[in-house]
Amino acid sequence: MVLEPQIKSQLNQYLQLMEGDVLLKVSAGNDKVSEDMLSLVDELASMSSRITVEKTNLERTPSFSVNRPGEDTGIVFAGIPLGHEFTSLVLALLQVSGRAPKAEQNVIDQIKNIEGEYHFESYISLSCQNCPDVVQALNLMSVLNPGISHTMIDGAAFKDEVESKDIMAVPTVYLNGESFTSGRMTVEEILAQLGSGPDASELADKDPFDVLVVGGGPAGASSAIYAARKGIRTGIVADRFGGQIMDTLSIENFISQKYTEGPKLAASLEEHVKEYDIDVMKLQRAKRLEKKDLIEIELENGAVLKSKSVILSTGARWRNVGVPGEQEFKNKGVAYCPHCDGPLFEGKDVAVIGGGNSGVEAAIDLAGIVNHVTVLEFMPELKADEVLQERLNSLPNVTVIKNAQTKEITGDDKVNGISYMDRDTEEVHHIELAGVFVQIGLVPNTDWLDGTLERNRFGEIVVDSHGATNVPGVFAAGDCTNSAYKQIIISMGSGATAALGAFDYLIRNTTPAESAAAK
């Protein structure tokens, strides 16, 4: 295996940042994956005098561990960490060499204070944009705490192991041999699940904000930055930074960037927010909003935050089909991310529910991996762009069924089929398959606001041209609102609008002394 010249050039620059020696212990067999893995580690060693290679026997073959001379860190890559995981490999080399990780000090302290033995195993696919966050978080924990170890396992290289554990979604994480979690997680979320997260009482003691942003997606980040630039006390509370774009692989319509990926854009947003004096409160969900002298936001952990104005940017989530079997077989054949989970269905039959752009794009993606794709569309015609439909219709292993109402997703311990009704004849049909990808759009994250402010029949928050809701001092932005179009760049613009609207509200509704301070 030879790295492409461009990648090798970039890698060479990163390897120059290594601060100490690194020993790669390699466990290889006679198979093609082992051969490619050996080529990769040998190439790494040829590029830096700080990297040496030693053959050994590890729990899995092919695999290699990343260590300091005389000290095992517990970091193991089972398979070849290329694709989206190449960054995970580079970071592991740098951090094991002694380069300080880019993590907040309180997070580092929490990791170091964990007591006990924790062995994590993360099952990933190299095409999964959600997996590197988990892999890099667990590697970081392994570097900082000798009681923690982590093995990344490429599902494509260890198919028998993946199938024996019925893993049908990535990333899936095991802890000490037992299922721990699945899906994207930050290091803060992992720490919280281990019971090592921040104390919720710290939030309740915070002074009131001038502007409190609820939600950390593009709209929320834009709102917080625009508010902070006005010199007013700004906070942002969010479950996770990045919002829905964290589940988006390819972004080609973000003006000024010909191409980027959701996780990269989310990281840039968070980095930009941290350039300002903004109180960022992650891993928190809002539970209740109440307008008093100040606006109160109660969090699910019981803490109450207070602010003179609030900007709601809670975004949207995948819409569920709402049929029997969907929840029962989630991550057991029911999936929402074709980029992440598609490789786990290689050579199998799957269905895609939804004939819009996202559904057709998913079907096109999956057609190159699986045996056959069936697209089920509720309406008489597909809603996807014509260019996508033309591409879809050119694929030999795709069947499109229109006027199809999904009735049930069937299975035993995992999905084995789907039933749908022909809306013309009302006849029910059943298709045997291994996976179902749900792609029927989004639903706004506004359930917690029921009865609090005006929402339309879709659950979207109704706002005016300034981003204001019908509750004085409460503004909203992004995909949770009645904005006509749901696009990243539009969400950012609406976030800026809401922040400026909130600032104008503060000027007109505070005492002269407070207004002068705000300026």
Curated annotation (Swiss-Prot):
<dbReference type="InterPro" id="IPR012081">
    <property type="entry name" value="Alkyl_hydroperoxide_Rdtase_suF"/>
</dbReference>
<feature type="disulfide bond" description="Redox-active">
    <location>
        <begin position="337"/>
        <end position="340"/>
    </location>
</feature>
<keyword id="KW-0249">Electron transport</keyword>
<feature type="binding site">
    <location>
        <begin position="469"/>
        <end position="479"/>
    </location>
    <ligand>
        <name>FAD</name>
    </ligand>
</feature>
<dbReference type="GO" id="GO:0005886">
    <property type="term" value="C:plasma membrane"/>
</dbReference>
<keyword id="KW-1278">Translocase</keyword>
<keyword id="KW-1015">Disulfide bond</keyword>
<comment type="function">
    <text>Transfer of electrons from NADH to the respiratory chain. The immediate electron acceptor for the enzyme is believed to be ubiquinone.</text>
</comment>
<keyword id="KW-0813">Transport</keyword>
<dbReference type="InterPro" id="IPR023753">
    <property type="entry name" value="FAD/NAD-binding_dom"/>
</dbReference>
<dbReference type="InterPro" id="IPR012336">
    <property type="entry name" value="Thioredoxin-like_fold"/>
</dbReference>
<protein>
    <recommendedName>
        <fullName>NADH dehydrogenase</fullName>
        <ecNumber>7.1.1.2</ecNumber>
    </recommendedName>
</protein>
<comment type="similarity">
    <text>Belongs to the class-II pyridine nucleotide-disulfide oxidoreductase family.</text>
</comment>
<dbReference type="GO" id="GO:0051287">
    <property type="term" value="F:NAD binding"/>
</dbReference>
<keyword id="KW-0560">Oxidoreductase</keyword>
<feature type="region of interest" description="Catalytic">
    <location>
        <begin position="184"/>
        <end position="519"/>
    </location>
</feature>
<feature type="region of interest" description="Membrane-binding">
    <location>
        <begin position="1"/>
        <end position="183"/>
    </location>
</feature>
<dbReference type="Pfam" id="PF07992">
    <property type="entry name" value="Pyr_redox_2"/>
</dbReference>
<dbReference type="GO" id="GO:0102039">
    <property type="term" value="F:NADH-dependent peroxiredoxin activity"/>
</dbReference>
<keyword id="KW-0274">FAD</keyword>
<dbReference type="InterPro" id="IPR008255">
    <property type="entry name" value="Pyr_nucl-diS_OxRdtase_2_AS"/>
</dbReference>
<dbReference type="GO" id="GO:0050660">
    <property type="term" value="F:flavin adenine dinucleotide binding"/>
</dbReference>
<dbReference type="InterPro" id="IPR036249">
    <property type="entry name" value="Thioredoxin-like_sf"/>
</dbReference>
<dbReference type="GO" id="GO:0000302">
    <property type="term" value="P:response to reactive oxygen species"/>
</dbReference>
<feature type="binding site">
    <location>
        <begin position="349"/>
        <end position="379"/>
    </location>
    <ligand>
        <name>NAD(+)</name>
    </ligand>
</feature>
<comment type="subunit">
    <text>Homodimer.</text>
</comment>
<dbReference type="InterPro" id="IPR036188">
    <property type="entry name" value="FAD/NAD-bd_sf"/>
</dbReference>
<keyword id="KW-0830">Ubiquinone</keyword>
<feature type="binding site">
    <location>
        <begin position="210"/>
        <end position="241"/>
    </location>
    <ligand>
        <name>FAD</name>
    </ligand>
</feature>
<keyword id="KW-0676">Redox-active center</keyword>
<keyword id="KW-0520">NAD</keyword>
<dbReference type="GO" id="GO:0008137">
    <property type="term" value="F:NADH dehydrogenase (ubiquinone) activity"/>
</dbReference>
<keyword id="KW-1003">Cell membrane</keyword>
<dbReference type="InterPro" id="IPR044142">
    <property type="entry name" value="AhpF_NTD_N"/>
</dbReference>
<dbReference type="InterPro" id="IPR044141">
    <property type="entry name" value="AhpF_NTD_C"/>
</dbReference>
<keyword id="KW-0285">Flavoprotein</keyword>
<dbReference type="GO" id="GO:0016668">
    <property type="term" value="F:oxidoreductase activity, acting on a sulfur group of donors, NAD(P) as acceptor"/>
</dbReference>
<dbReference type="Pfam" id="PF13192">
    <property type="entry name" value="Thioredoxin_3"/>
</dbReference>
<keyword id="KW-0472">Membrane</keyword>
<dbReference type="InterPro" id="IPR050097">
    <property type="entry name" value="Ferredoxin-NADP_redctase_2"/>
</dbReference>
